[in-house]
């Protein structure tokens, strides 16, 4: 039997999953990742915790599967994107906590860049809007605010990376400083047309090029693990940011195919093939996972692959807020039964703009609201409104995506594949299909983020001949079909847009 090991380093936990070559889960392990909130709007992780929890789960998963490193053909890595790590090349120690993708401390710098008129140039080169969400301004903050960091960076003593780079550095004993194209494309420093770091952007943000990792295709040779870590060396053959990895794991390989991941946030991606498309509807363009040619893996010229993306900052996190903030539930699993205890939200609308609103609105100053309260409102109505807010935000993304697809000469999205922890909530998935008016399809294996990393590693190591073999492995577990009329769905979305305007104080 051939096995693949996927390391899935997320915002709230580190996980490792052993897959067989059919994409079935053989074993898995998970550890929570401590969250650090130094100030309002700031979110950090300790890079040492990231590494400690990730390597521990890898060992646990291998032990649970009762296999050794010699049984694993290759290892794949997928990770929370944009989260920024800066460390000392000699000691391997971080110079500061990692600044997490949710962190908003760099917003003043972003506002300054927008006021200076740089956004059109940045969007054309990177596919991204100027936002504190991305790595570039987080890295600039570290260089400016950590004592001695800029001088050390300019002397070549420091290394920058997103979480994948940090893990590869640790896994290889500091021998390899590298990232993949999908993670690089989320930094706001990477030119997606030239497939390289952009010198003009580096100069604009005062970031020394010598800080940056080498960039490779997502399915290519990233080195091998230090033999002492897992009892033997394992080739690292696949790396992708979590959302591009989920797109790959959902077998969305052709233009027009779309997926939505329901996690801490929600992340919708639509494959656009080899064409770079600039959104006119508030979405981002990002590099999809790229596959190196079989010859000279890691150094060939893969065919470009792009995706349109929309990100919801607060998705499943709204359920955590119900539990930890309002104490309305004692565990996240209770939310479906509580929401199902009422037939609808009773007119309550929740906009969970706790850290502003992401795509397609891009309202960093928006704040969370609950409207439509009456004397008859119960906590069940609020719970249902919280769940529905996840679907409303995702529906706004898909509608924007379909408009962009039609403008580019394509067709609207006709089916949405779903994954992530919250996709097991049948109430949420049915309401999502009702709002969208298209089938929402849940796969047999919902761990598609980790599966995508395993598939990438399998491609580079020869387990799979190509993406056609992966498409043949994909299976649906359930299709949710719309039950609302188009007119009723439009009424619901109109109420949502009104609530968004209130939250944004428009």
UniProtKB/Swiss-Prot annotation:
One of its GO terms (biological process) is glycerol metabolic process. ATP binds at residues 11-13, 264, 316, 320, 421. ADP binds at residues 11, 15, 264, 316, 421, 425. Glycerol binds at residues 81-82, 133, 242-243. Pathway: Polyol metabolism; glycerol degradation via glycerol kinase pathway; sn-glycerol 3-phosphate from glycerol: step 1/1. GO terms for cellular component: cytosol. Inhibited by fructose 1,6-bisphosphate (FBP). The keyword Transmembrane helix does not apply. InterPro entries: ATPase_NBD (IPR043129), Carb_kinase_FGGY (IPR000577), Carb_kinase_FGGY_CS (IPR018483), FGGY_C (IPR018485), FGGY_N (IPR018484), Glycerol_kin (IPR005999). The keyword Ubl conjugation does not apply. Its EC number is 2.7.1.30. Gene3D superfamilies: 3.30.420.40. It catalyses: glycerol + ATP = sn-glycerol 3-phosphate + ADP + H(+). Keywords: ATP-binding, Glycerol metabolism, Kinase, Nucleotide-binding, Transferase. It is an enzyme of class 2 (transferase). Sn-glycerol 3-phosphate binds at residues 11, 81-82, 133, 242. HAMAP family: Glycerol_kin. Belongs to the FGGY kinase family. PANTHER family: GLYCEROL KINASE (PTHR10196:SF69), SUGAR KINASE (PTHR10196). This is Glycerol kinase. The gene is glpK.
């Amino acid at each position: 039997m051939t096995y693949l090991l996927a390391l899935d380093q997320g915002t709230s936990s580190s996980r490792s999953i052993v897959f067989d070559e059919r994409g079935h889960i053989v074993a898995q392990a998970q550890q929570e990742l401590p969250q650090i909130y130094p100030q309002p709007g700031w979110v950090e992780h300790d890079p040492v915790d990231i590494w400690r929890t990730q390597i521990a789960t890898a060992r646990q998963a291998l032990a649970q599967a009762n296999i050794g490193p010699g049984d694993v053909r290759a290892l794949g890595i997928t990770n929370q994107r944009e989260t920024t790590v800066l460390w000392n090349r000699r000691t391997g120690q971080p110079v500061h906590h990692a600044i997490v993708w949710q962190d908003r401390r760099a917003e003043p710098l972003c506002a300054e860049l927008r006021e200076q008129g740089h956004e059109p140039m940045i969007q054309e080169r990177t596919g991204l809007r100027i936002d504190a969400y991305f790595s570039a301004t987080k890295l600039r903050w570290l260089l400016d605010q950590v004592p001695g960091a800029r001088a050390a960076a300019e002397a070549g003593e420091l290394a920058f990376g997103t979480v994948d780079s940090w893990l590869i550095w640790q896994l290889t004993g500091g021998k390899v400083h590298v990232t993949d194209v999908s993670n690089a494309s989320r930094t706001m420093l990477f030119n997606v047309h030239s497939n390289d770091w952009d010198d003009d952007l580096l100069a604009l943000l005062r970031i020394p090029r010598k800080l940056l990792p080498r960039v490779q295709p997502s399915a290519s040779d990233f080195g091998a693990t230090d033999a002492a870590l897992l009892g033997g060396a394992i080739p690292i053959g696949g790396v992708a940011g979590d959302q591009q990895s989920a797109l790959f794991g959902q077998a969305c390989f052709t233009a027009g195919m779309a997926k939505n991941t329901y996690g801490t946030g929600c992340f919708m991606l639509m494959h656009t093939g080899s064409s770079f498309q600039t959104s006119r509807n508030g979405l981002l363009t990002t590099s999809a996972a790229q596959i190196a040619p079989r010859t000279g893996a890691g150094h060939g010229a893969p065919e470009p692959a792009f995706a349109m993306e929309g990100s919801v900052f607060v998705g499943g996190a709204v359920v955590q807020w119900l539990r930890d903030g309002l104490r309305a539930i004692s565990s996240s699993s209770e939310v479906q039964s509580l929401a199902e205890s009422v037939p609808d939200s009773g007119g309550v609308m929740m906009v969970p703009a706790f850290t502003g609103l992401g795509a397609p609105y891009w309202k960093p100053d928006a704040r969370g609201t609950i409207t439509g309260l009456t004397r008859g409102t119960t906590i069940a109505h609020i719970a249902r409104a919280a769940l529905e807010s996840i679907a409303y935000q995702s529906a706004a993304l898909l509608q924007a995506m379909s408009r962009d697809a039609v403008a580019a000469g394509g067709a609207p999205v006709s089916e949405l594949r779903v994954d992530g922890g919250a996709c097991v909530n049948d109430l949420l998935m049915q309401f999502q299909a009702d709002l969208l008016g298209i089938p929402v399809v849940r796969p047999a294996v919902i761990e598609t983020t980790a599966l995508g990393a395993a598939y990438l590693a399998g491609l580079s190591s020869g387990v799979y001949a190509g993406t056609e073999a992966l498409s043949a492995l994909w299976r649906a577990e359930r299709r949710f079909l719309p039950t609302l009329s188009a007119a009723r769905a439009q009424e619901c979305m109109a109420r949502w847009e009104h609530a968004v305007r209130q939250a944004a104080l428009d």
